A protein has these predicted regions:
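Hydrophobic membrane-insertion alpha-helices, especially the h-region
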Residues: 6-22
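N-terminal capping segment at the start of a domain
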Residues: 23-70, 85, 125, 293-303
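Second-shell loop/turn segments in exported
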Residues: 35-43, 60-69, 92-94, 126-136, ...
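A non-catalytic alpha/beta surface segment that caps or lines the substrate-entry region
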Residues: 40, 54-109, 258-260
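Active-site-adjacent substrate-binding region
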Residues: 43, 207-327
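Extracytoplasmic/secreted proteins, especially bacterial periplasmic and envelope-associated proteins
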Residues: 48-51, 55, 73-89, 138, ...
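Proline/glycine-enriched tight loop/beta-turn segments at coil->beta junctions
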Residues: 110-117
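Acidic/histidine-rich catalytic neighborhood of metal-dependent amide-processing enzymes
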Residues: 127-237, 266-269
Length: 327
């Protein structure tokens, strides 16, 4: 009996220590109601978000090597949008399973001519035959809005804006993945890298109780059960970047924000364009609505533009813009 009691005591202490440790890696921000919102700016940004999502997920539709012509149409559209905003689009082109595919990127140099590199990107392909409004026209639309906002800004870091190709299967977690190629490119520059931000499915929100799920039960004890927040997710090495971005949301956006630092071996936190940057040793985070852990339209034909919450997407834009404006 004494051994059982000792075992339970040690187990209880260990569990308490784990939760205390993990709580120190959780960066929660209480939503603020005192942040002024420029109605003219919000209207213009929301209009742009809707336009870009509708073009990618509505007019073009499924964008993958399975629907190769649509993938090319999406690439052409994004190159045009880069130019309209005032950036010269560059292509990182390569062969993937018999198809010529391209990352589309633009570099905003620092005001000093040197400084660290920050990569911010979103994948523009969709899964097989699905329209991919949330996954991931939403992320691309927010990226384009950020590019427009920061065009004339004076920043101390070099910002790489990237639309990645081939995030989805059968290319993910392989050299055919666009982010894999770009992470390699950045590592070969031999320059200091501040980190990478992946905008991955950022447009679906649900305030109903029980609408949010998690890959592990223990996370349910620490995070909300309503899918009305944006998550900033990183591995242990990326805790500083997670903290900085979460804090920027607190000062720039009224949107509920949850920062999570988790071990890299958890498969569900490594399912997007940030993962190849982790493998290169860089800090990287995924800003996400958590996709299939909230959105029943994930990887379905129902992932349409009219299922997204553009007001909250605007708040995602505000939070990331707030972070980038500090660089």
């Amino acid at each position: 009996m004494k051994k059982v009691i000792l075992f339970l005591f040690i187990g209880g202490i260990s569990l308490a220590a784990f939760f205390a440790w993990y709580s120190s890696l959780r960066f929660k921000q209480t939503p603020r109601t005192d942040i002024p919102i420029d109605s003219a700016e919000s209207s213009a940004v929301i209009s742009g978000l809707k336009k870009d999502v509708l073009e990618l997920a509505g007019n073009i539709g499924a964008r993958s090597t399975t629907h190769y012509q649509n993938l090319l149409a999406a690439s052409k559209y994004l190159q045009t949008r880069f130019a309209e905003i005032g950036y010269e689009p560059s292509l990182q082109t390569y062969q993937a399973k018999g198809h010529e595919v391209s990352n589309i990127y633009a570099i905003k140099p620092s005001s000093t001519g040197d400084g660290e590199v920050l990569v911010i990107g979103a994948h523009y392909d969709s899964q097989y035959s699905n329209p991919g409004a949330d996954d991931n026209a939403s992320g691309v639309a927010v990226l384009l809005a950020l590019m427009k906002s920061l065009k004339s800004a004076s920043l101390k870091r070099n910002i790489h804006f990237v639309c990645f190709v081939n995030e989805e299967l059968p290319h993910s977690h392989s050299p055919d993945m666009g982010a894999w190629r770009y992470a390699k490119f950045v590592s070969e520059l031999k320059v200091p890298v501040l980190g990478m931000i992946s905008l991955e499915s950022v447009g679906y929100f649900d305030s109903a109780k029980g609408s949010q799920r998690y890959p592990f039960k223990f996370l349910e004890l620490m995070y909300p059960d309503s899918g009305d927040f944006i998550a900033v997710v990183g591995n242990l090495k990326s805790h500083t970047l997670v903290s900085s971005i979460t804090e920027a949301f607190h000062t720039s956006s009224p949107l509920k924000t949850e920062g999570a630092v988790l071990p890299q071996f958890i498969r569900d936190i490594a399912r997007s364009d940030h993962a190849p940057f982790w493998k290169r040793g860089f800090q990287a985070v995924m800003v996400t609505d958590t996709a299939n852990f909230r959105n029943a339209n994930y990887h379905q034909p129902t992932d349409h533009p009219n299922t997204l919450d553009y007001e909250r997407m605007y708040q995602v834009y505000r939070g990331i813009n707030g972070y980038l404006s500090t660089l």
